[in-house]
Amino acid sequence: MACRLYLALIFSCVYLICLSSQQETGFVYNGFEQADLFIDGIAKILPDGLLQLTNTTELQMGHAFFKKPFDFDPSSSLSFYTHFVCALVPPKLGADGGHGIVFVVSPSIDLSHAYATQYLGVFSNLTNGTSSSHLLAIELDTVKTVEFNELEKPHVGIDLNSPISVESALPSYFSNALGKNISINLLSGEPIQVWVDYDGSFLNVTLAPIEIKKPNQPLISRAINLSEIFQEKMYVGFSSSTGNLLSNHYILGWSFSRRKEQLQSLNLSTLPRVPLPKEEKKKLSPLLIGLVILLVIPVVMVLGGVYWYRRKKYAEVKEWWEKEYGPHRFSYKSLYKATNGFRKDCRVGKGGFGEVYKGTLPGGRHIAVKRLSHDAEQGMKQFVAEVVTMGNLQHRNLVPLLGYCRRKCELLLVSEYMPNGSLDQYLFHEGNPSPSWYQRISILKDIASALSYLHTGTKQVVLHRDIKASNVMLDSEFNGRLGDFGMAKFHDRGTNLSATAAVGTIGYMAPELITMGTSMKTDVYAFGAFLLEVICGRRPVEPELPVGKQYLVKWVYECWKEACLFKTRDPRLGVEFLPEEVEMVLKLGLLCTNAMPESRPAMEQVVQYLNQDLPLPIFSPSTPGIGAFMPVSMEALSAIGVSSVRNSSVSMFVTHTILDGHGR
């Protein structure tokens, strides 16, 4: 028998310990669908889990309490911590509402004796100020009550046994970022967070909007000894009331604990949404309707004018000869939007025939848009025909021409954007890293392959006529892409190109260009000069150097003749290269710049030499045409009307490639 009593005593102790532990742990409700609450008055839990304390019914109150009391034994450490989210929604946003929400700690969940209106469903005339009430109320009051000595505006207050607050403040929160208090509109209908913390000495009340973390400083901090007010068992909950002024008062979520470290966080993202009042539709009076009509007519006229102006602004010229090129044509409006209206901050280059802009198409593709003017109809027709034909060229080492747009006196050319700019930026600009030997030889192979394709891999022979480092673009992987077809010419295989003005850049132009005209061999000559430019790290013509070094081809030849060919390499190459490979490429450059066109290799052979699929033919400094450099003078070019300058060419036609920050 004694054993049974002993076991029963043990079980009772365990039960009491568990119960005490449960009470100290507290609770958390992210919505109130499954909440264990005592509810009375007009309070109710809505289907979405929202706790509604009052609605827009006059002179009513509602209560919601946690059903189990908490142990607040004055002999032990007395503290509690709570965090809840509420919303006060008047019948019409921006209007007054009443009367407010109160967080209550009470010895009883029966507040039927309390009054509505300014008493907030907690107090009454009979119990105001009496110590026997044992009530703590944290009020969010939206109506001024003169008899309670309340503030002019909605306020937050601490009430002890009476609706007259012992401490109050206008609703606001401390901004950690700004270091000052920011006001809060209690009747905005927006969710508001409230923290009430009591550590045994100080009662702190803190507010913040739903999207703000708990501020570092409370709104109210009051030294209070709640052990003189609290009984051993106390209930926690909410109260709300209406009067002649009405509001929907909601609680979205609630967390409570006797201990700070055990207070569970609310999941703010999952809380139910607050229903806001719908705006009433007002009927328009006949007078107002008439005024609206009188206003609408001029507005319609203005909009019509704007529409006409925009149509004229985006109008594009189309002729019968452009129909066959339709798939390559962009609308002016799409390019206008892609470049943000051709804003200055989108401009990335400027050439002899127009400006270059970076743009982005709706799908995210980056493009380069060259904007130029024209007035010669026949010349523009020929240009469009040639450019669109080039749009059909497909090779991995060509800058893809995507299309064009013709509008009034403008032509816009669209190509793929090359993010790493042009090769000359890395060869001659000290601020950029110098390409390694591997990168240089790889780029040379890329451009040789592209030029071989233009000469032999297309339906018509394509002559580039302006090969140089500034026209070699680098994609995101630093692969070489041949661009700038502004000077390009086409002719059928088996026929010769009709005589045209000599074009190009000094130092890249073959000696026979003036007398014999353009051919595949003149492209080979330009490639040879470009090849030496890349390996030697200097431009083909530099007048500021001593006479013996001004012309790159001549200087490399003289160094070979003096058995010091190796010293012509770019000193920035470092040591990571094969000497025999450097020597082979330098000699190939001299072979391609042979003064005798028939002695120059075809681009197909150049590709084989660079890939070392074919040995370089044996020749020496005494071989006819090698090193016989005959520079085309500026005077001679001017005499035949060539548009060309040192270091950059002003093309007969416009470039369609883009130099990232530098234009032709």
Swiss-Prot record:
Q: At the top level of its lineage, which domain of life is listed? A: Eukaryota
Catalysed reaction(s) here are: L-seryl-[protein] + ATP = O-phospho-L-seryl-[protein] + ADP + H(+); L-threonyl-[protein] + ATP = O-phospho-L-threonyl-[protein] + ADP + H(+)
Residue stretches spanning the membrane: 287-307
One GO cellular component this record assigns the protein to is:
plasma membrane
Q: What happens when the gene is disrupted?
A: Increased susceptibility to the fungus Alternaria brassicicola.
Q: Domain Protein kinase: where?
A: 342-619
In its UniProt record, a GO molecular function of this protein is: ATP binding
Q: Which UniProt keywords apply?
A: ATP-binding, Cell membrane, Glycoprotein, Kinase, Lectin, Membrane, Nucleotide-binding, Plant defense, Receptor, Serine/threonine-protein kinase, Signal, Transferase, Transmembrane, Transmembrane helix
Tell me which stretches of the chain form a coiled coil.
Answer: none
Tissues/organs with expression: Mostly expressed in roots and flowers, and, to a lower extent, in leaves.
Where does the UniProt entry say this protein principally localizes? membrane
The membrane-topology field of this record reads: Single-pass type I membrane protein
Q: Its Enzyme Commission number?
A: 2.7.11.1
Q: Which InterPro entries match?
A: ConA-like_dom_sf (IPR013320), Kinase-like_dom_sf (IPR011009), L-type_Lectin-RKs (IPR050528), Legume_lectin_dom (IPR001220), Prot_kinase_dom (IPR000719), Protein_kinase_ATP_BS (IPR017441), Ser/Thr_kinase_AS (IPR008271)
Biological process (GO) annotations?
A: cellular response to ethylene stimulus; cellular response to salt stress; defense response to fungus; protein autophosphorylation
Compartments in which it is found: Cell membrane
Q: Which residues are glycosylated?
A: N55, N125, N128, N181, N204, N225, N267
Q: Where is the signal peptide?
A: 1-21
Under SMART domains, the record lists:
S_TKc (SM00220)
Where in the sequence is the active site? Answer: D466
Induction trigger = By salt and ethylene (ET).
Post-translational modification, briefly?
A: Autophosphorylated on Ser and Thr residues.
The family note in this entry says:
In the C-terminal section; belongs to the protein kinase superfamily. Ser/Thr protein kinase family. In the N-terminal section; belongs to the leguminous lectin family.
Function of the molecule: Involved in resistance response to the pathogenic fungus Alternaria brassicicola.
Q: Write the protein's name.
A: L-type lectin-domain containing receptor kinase I.3
